[in-house]
């Protein structure tokens, strides 16, 4: 309690001190730049009183001694001991699936053996299982699949352990002398962070950039934890109806990179306000709400007990199998009672729509914003991992075509292009239903598609697009393509975040050019962050021979003559809803 009071007082002090240090202007012309928090920067000139107090606040919260010149010791969040026991003999295999018969056989076999399907795309299915179960799985598969697999991860406990921050010793040979440009991301985004660090960090950022950021909660989890979010924006007319973009991560607890990525996006939006014309414009024209983890209970559980836990932590009808898949718990086209009724399944959707507490809480918050605060959702980004895909509605069915399909595809291709120009990583763009299916007979051009892992009704993506008529709604599956899966090393946090932040800027550009045509004079190309990676550096993509072949099928053109394609947009109008979707006005 005492430490909580101390933290609270420190944050209040930081908020009061920095209130006069943030830009006060509301015009599109950027006000004086807001300096981001610098945890280890040196000063050649005497510090002003508020600067000294600000640094004291940060030192007190982060535990950085004033005289320390080496990199601070990370928190000791070593891998749980249960990991080596629970996953001692587990491996991850990738199966190449061709045709409906193989897809159905693999789906049935994984259901019979209660296996954990890590990813399923039009090209492959990744499955985690114990080595001693491999013969049983192969015995249930047709001959064509008996040899159609390769190992992705052959030592799962070691891979799990590597994702936790390691305790670092600060010996004389390990000193790190920071440059004056050393900033908070060098520390916070150096490792994955537990919720006990993320929440105070969000509070600190909100207090430091209080002119355009504030901490909110969008709900309460089953175990009673707040679901924290950062709300960013600066309106010249308080209380006016403003378009809103919602960015969420951490629906599935084990997808740590999604949580870090949302935090990275929030950080860059906050710190670049005032110095970036694009970010300043976006925060003055739109409200942004960023939720690093929708599933705080599950996220905490991955740190304390089981790194690969996926669902939330609420009880089910089977006491030994808690948890509901929050991304199958939404009400639109919910089909959990038809597809997956086993509480032990990783995809268990509950016994009724919105049984997943956190999904229900987020939906209530969104509805309250639209009904009582005049909010209009115009963008929704739901970050997941892994597979490097940009998915648009609908998830529940490939036979239902979204009414704004052309616009969704156009912007989706634009997002993929920006990412590729940033770090040279390829993100596929497709319907969310195709993200979990394979074409009939292995023919990618075929129109008849069959699910690998069952229906995916009840997704948040479909709900925001259909129920709230969010114009641009995407589920983005981040890195990688299988080399590490859910266990992406921490050195990829910043490159992945850079990709995602540039994609967010592209979304903002798309919206701005639609909503303010010819008004906002912004050089968007100069605003994108430059990725640290080059084509010659190690890629996170799986590089077996068959995977290299699939890269040839990417349809996003990079020719300069086609650049203007990504900037064109033809508005489509909405009409009354039908039971299964919208009609597009001709």
UniProtKB/Swiss-Prot annotation:
Glycosylation sites: 337, 368
GO CC, alphabetical: extracellular space; vacuole
Gene3D superfamilies: Zn peptidases
Family: Belongs to the peptidase M14 family.
Residues where substrate binds: 252-255, 310, 327-328, 385-386
Listed GO MF terms: zinc ion binding
Protein name: Inactive metallocarboxypeptidase ecm14
Gene: ecm14
Residue ranges of the region described as Disordered: 529-564
Any single biological process term in GO: cell wall organization
Segments of skewed composition (Polar residues): 534-543
Cofactor binding note: Binds 1 zinc ion per subunit.
Lineage, broadest ranks: Eukaryota, Fungi, Dikarya, Ascomycota, Pezizomycotina
Keywords in alphabetical order: Cell wall biogenesis/degradation, Disulfide bond, Glycoprotein, Metal-binding, Secreted, Signal, Vacuole, Zinc
Keyword S-adenosyl-L-methionine recorded: no
Binding site for Zn(2+): 252, 255, 384
Function description: Inactive carboxypeptidase that may play a role in cell wall organization and biogenesis.
SMART domains for this protein: Zn_pept
Signal peptide (residue range): 1-21
Organism annotation: Emericella nidulans (strain FGSC A4 / ATCC 38163 / CBS 112.46 / NRRL 194 / M139) (Aspergillus nidulans)
Residues annotated as domain Peptidase M14: 191-511
Locations listed in the record: Vacuole; Secreted
Cysteine disulfide links: 321-344
Keyword Hydrolase: no
InterPro entries (UniProt xref): Peptidase_M14 (IPR000834)
């Amino acid at each position: 309690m005492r430490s909580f009071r101390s933290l609270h007082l420190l944050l209040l002090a930081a908020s009061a001190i920095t209130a006069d240090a943030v830009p006060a202007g509301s015009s599109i012309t950027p006000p004086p730049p807001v300096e981001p928090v610098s945890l280890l920067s040196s000063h050649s000139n005497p510090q002003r009183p508020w600067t000294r107090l600000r640094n004291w606040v940060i030192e007190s919260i982060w535990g950085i001694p004033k005289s320390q010149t080496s990199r601070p010791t990370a928190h000791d969040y070593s891998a749980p001991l249960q990991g080596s026991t629970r996953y001692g003999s587990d491996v991850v295999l990738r199966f190449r699936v061709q045709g409906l018969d193989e897809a159905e056989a693999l789906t049935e076999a994984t259901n019979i053996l209660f296996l954990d399907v890590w990813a399923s795309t039009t090209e492959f299915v990744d499955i985690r299982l114990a080595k001693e179960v491999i013969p049983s799985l192969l015995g249930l598969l047709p001959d064509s699949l008996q040899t159609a697999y390769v190992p992705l991860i052959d030592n799962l406990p070691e891979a799990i352990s590597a994702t936790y921050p390691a305790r670092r010793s600060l010996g004389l040979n390990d000193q790190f002398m920071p440059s004056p440009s050393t900033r908070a991301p060098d520390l916070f985004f150096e490792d994955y962070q537990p919720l006990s660090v993320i929440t105070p960090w969000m509070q600190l950022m909100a207090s430091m950039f209080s002119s355009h950021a504030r901490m909110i909660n969008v709900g309460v989890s089953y175990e009673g934890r707040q679901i924290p979010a950062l709300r960013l924006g600066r309106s010249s007319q308080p209380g006016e109806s403003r378009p809103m973009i919602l960015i969420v991560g951490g629906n599935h607890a084990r997808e740590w990179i999604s949580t870090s990525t949302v935090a990275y996006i929030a950080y860059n939006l906050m710190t670049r306000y005032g110095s970036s014309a694009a970010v300043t414009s976006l925060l003055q024209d739109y409200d942004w709400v960023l939720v690093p983890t929708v599933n705080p209970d599950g996220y905490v559980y991955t740190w304390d007990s089981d790194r690969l836990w996926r669902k939330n932590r609420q009880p089910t009808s089977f006491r030994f199998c808690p948890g509901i898949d929050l991304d199958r718990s939404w009400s639109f086209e919910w089909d959990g009672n038809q597809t997956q009724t086993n509480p032990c399944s990783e995809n268990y959707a509950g016994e009724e729509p919105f049984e997943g507490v956190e999904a229900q809480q987020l939906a209530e918050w969104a509805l309250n914003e639209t009904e009582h605060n005049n909010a209009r959702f115009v963008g929704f980004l739901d970050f997941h991992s892994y597979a490097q895909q940009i998915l648009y509605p609908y998830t529940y069915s490939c036979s239902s075509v979204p009414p704004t399909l052309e616009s969704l595809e156009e912007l989706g291709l634009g997002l993929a292009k920006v990412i590729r120009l940033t770090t040279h990583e390829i993100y596929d763009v497709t319907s969310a239903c195709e993200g979990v299916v394979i074409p009939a007979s292995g023919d990618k051009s075929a129109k008849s598609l069959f699910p690998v892992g069952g229906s995916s009704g009840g997704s948040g993506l479909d709900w925001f697009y259909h129920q709230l008529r969010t114009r641009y709604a995407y589920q983005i599956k981040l890195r990688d393509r299988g080399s590490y899966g859910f266990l992406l090393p921490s050195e990829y946090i910043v490159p992945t975040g850079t990709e995602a932040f540039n994609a967010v800027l592209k979304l903002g550009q798309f919206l701005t050019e639609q909503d303010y045509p010819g008004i906002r004079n912004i050089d968007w190309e100069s605003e994108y962050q430059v990725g640290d990676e080059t084509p010659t550096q190690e890629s996170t993509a799986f590089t077996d021979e068959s995977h290299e072949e699939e890269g040839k099928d990417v349809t996003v053109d990079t020719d300069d003559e086609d650049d203007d394609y990504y900037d064109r947009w033809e508005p489509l109008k909405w009409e009354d809803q039908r039971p299964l979707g919208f009609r597009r006005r001709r």
